[in-house]
Curated annotation (Swiss-Prot):
Keywords: Cytoplasm, Kinase, Magnesium, Metal-binding, Phosphotransferase system, Sugar transport, Transferase, Transport
Gene expressing this chain: ptsI
Regions crossing the membrane: none
Provenance organism: Lysinibacillus sphaericus
Pfam families linked to this entry: PEP-utilisers_N (PF05524), PEP-utilizers (PF00391), PEP-utilizers_C (PF02896)
Organism taxonomic ancestry: Bacteria, Bacillati, Bacillota, Bacilli, Bacillales
Misc note: The reaction takes place in three steps, mediated by a phosphocarrier histidine residue located on the surface of the central domain. The two first partial reactions are catalyzed at an active site located on the N-terminal domain, and the third partial reaction is catalyzed at an active site located on the C-terminal domain. For catalytic turnover, the central domain swivels from the concave surface of the N-terminal domain to that of the C-terminal domain.
Family: Belongs to the PEP-utilizing enzyme family.
The protein, known as: Phosphoenolpyruvate-protein phosphotransferase
EC number, as in UniProt: 2.7.3.9
PROSITE patterns recorded: PEP_ENZYMES_2
Length: 570
């Protein structure tokens, strides 16, 4: 038995076989071949295996999603059988006596460059199809395996170096019981998505992919941050009992599902949920959320080969707004860039992508990328209580420009006879220290603030939240950071505006008492944290927590703040 200590990322306990999700090494050299026919047969075998791999993926996608998503795999199958692509590869092998890997790379690169140069969205998408299929064929030529999260059909625990947002979005929780990564922290996107999917997860192991083999029996303890590899029978029994205790506690919390969140001294605050897709609605309602405080719209764009249409986005937003039955739904406009990239939307490589051309900066430059989802949102607004917010706002001019585009699209829709709600609140994320410092200015023009602590902490402390070497500086309880939160809440309340928080701090047991004392109006978190947080808030007095917050703002270190919270709520 091997024991790994790591970072608890998503609550729960899972016991299952390991499924290594490790990208293969697809490097190769150009070689000269003597037997051209044998080399062409190698290519034919790789093509056949690729086709065998794609057909089940198409069928599974058709069952789980829709014909539109399944059409991606149909396009890939057409590439595999395209004589205009395969013919030149075989011809190059015959004419130049080169290996199939090299011929495949040279010919496919030529087609990719050709399609990417065309000023046509459909043809550009074909370039992505060729890249994807080429990698699959190359993997089979090299005897490697490209993992496909959507093809998993048995209960497993995924083991990966990291999981991108698009990969995590494809996980099916009926089969993926948990995951383990080498890198990342509690606020990394893989961790956030783990909580959204309600599956146990641990991150930052450092050695999972080098220690764990396919088929190993694993225990993932997402409560305390531990992994057991091939555990003994006694350890398995112990963790089965621990899992049962956890489920019992969840059942106790479930009695609070239909209750409002009211403090011990009668003050109501709102507990909302963070979501990434309409599929998350079931969990949101099951856990008794009083609204949605963050809908990450960029996940509509992931795990696919082209931009979602306006109608497709409209349907997603309509589904969520109707599903929440009049409860507030805060939808964030596109936050692409940083660590969220799309294969069909190439972005310039940057030295510091988190400080670069992302989110509202990208949208204000590529306005059609911005206007399409805005139109979809405005059309859907009549189906519920919609609030719209813009991410990564740094200056008041950015907010004004974004709002002007939104209002322009609203007027166009009205002129075309479309019905649009007259009561849409327009707010912004507070994720940049400059915004917090100028909150009094912003508060005069916004309808609300939502504090995005994940980015705001790393920008305040100059500490990359994905870098384990500086993780000690990622301090939600640092008095400097708490003072920024206080500034934002005070500025908003001076203008009778409300403040929410949609970062992971909003559901943190130690942070909740402080945030209640600082006057936070809305706590938005992973759905699985709502009932636990409601139980905690019902035991706290706002008056007592205000005194705690005042003390916390006067101390010098995060450690002192944490100690004061523990003493106050023990």
């Amino acid at each position: 038995m091997t024991h790994l200590a790591c970072i608890a990322a998503s609550d729960g306990i899972a016991i299952a076989k390991a499924y290594r999700f490790v990208q293969p090494n697809l490097t190769f050299s150009q070689t000269t071949v003597q037997d051209v026919q044998a080399e062409q047969q190698r290519l034919a075998a790789a093509l056949a295996k690729t086709e065998q791999e794609l057909r089940p993926s198409k069928q599974q996608t058709l069952k789980k999603f829709s014909a539109e998503e399944a059409a991606i795999f149909e396009a890939h199958l057409l590439v595999v059988k395209d004589s205009e692509l395969i013919g030149p590869i075989n011809q190059k092998t015959a004419d130049e006596g080169v290996n199939a890997e090299f011929a495949l790379h040279e010919v496919s690169s030529m087609f990719v460059a050709l399609f990417e140069s065309m000023d046509d969205e459909y043809m550009s998408a074909r370039a992505s199809d060729i890249k994807d299929v080429t990698n699959r064929i190359l993997a089979h030529l090299l005897g490697a395996h490209i993992p496909n999260p959507s093809s998993i059909s048995e209960q497993v625990i995924i083991v990966a170096n990291d999981l991108t947002p698009s990969e995590t979005a494809q996980l099916d929780r009926n089969f993926v019981l948990g995951f383990i990564t080498d890198i990342g922290g509690r606020t990394s996107h893989s961790a956030i998505m783990g909580r959204s999917l309600e599956i146990p997860a641990v991150v930052g192991t450092g050695v999972a992919t080098t220690t764990i083999q396919d088929g190993d029996i694993l225990i993932v303890d997402g409560l305390s941050g531990q992994v057991f590899v091939n555990p003994t029978a006694d350890v398995i029994v112990s963790y089965q009992e621990k899992a049962q205790s956890y489920h019992t506690q969840q059942a106790e919390w479930s009695t609070l599902v239909n209750e409002q969140t009211v403090s011990k001294d009668g003050v109501h605050v709102e507990l909302a949920a963070n979501i990434g897709s309409p599929g998350d609605l079931e969990g949101v309602l099951r856990h008794g959320a009083e609204g949605i405080g963050l809908y990450r719209t960029e996940f509509l764009y992931m795990g696919r080969e082209n931009l979602p249409s306006e109608d497709e986005q409209f349907t997603a937003y309509q589904t969520v707004l109707e599903g929440m039955q009049g409860k507030p739904v805060v939808i964030r406009t596109l936050d692409l860039g940083g660590d969220k990239h799309l294969p069909y939307l190439p972005l310039q490589e940057e030295m510091n992508p988190f400080l670069g051309h992302r989110a509202i900066r990208l949208c204000l430059e590529q306005q059609e990328l911005f206007r399409t989802p805005l139109r979809a949102l405005l059309r859907a607004s009549v189906y519920g209580n919609l609030k719209i917010m813009f991410p990564i706002i740094a200056t008041i001019q950015e907010f004004r420009d974004a709002k002007a585009i939104l209002l322009e699209e609203q007027e166009k829709l009205k002129a075309a006879g479309e019905e649009v709600s007259a009561d849409i609140e327009i707010g912004m994320m507070v994720e940049i220290p400059a915004t917090a410092v100028m909150a009094d200015v912003f508060a005069k023009e916004v309808d609300f603030f939502s504090i995005g602590t994940n980015d705001l902490i790393q920008y305040t402390m100059a500490a990359d939240r994905m870098n384990e070497k500086v993780s000690y500086l990622y301090q939600p309880y640092n008095p400097a950071f708490l003072r920024l939160i206080q500034m934002v809440i005070h500025a908003a309340h001076q203008e009778q505006k409300w403040v929410g928080m949609c970062g992971e701090m909003a559901g943190d047991e130690l942070a909740v008492p402080l945030l209640l004392g600082l006057g936070l109006d809305e706590f938005s978190m992973s759905a699985t944290s709502i009932l636990k947080t409601r139980s905690l808030l019902k035991r706290l007095s706002v008056k007592d927590m205000q005194a705690l917050a005042t003390e916390a703002l006067q101390v010098a270190t995060a450690e002192e703040v944490m100690e004061k919270v523990k003493q106050a709520v023990k």
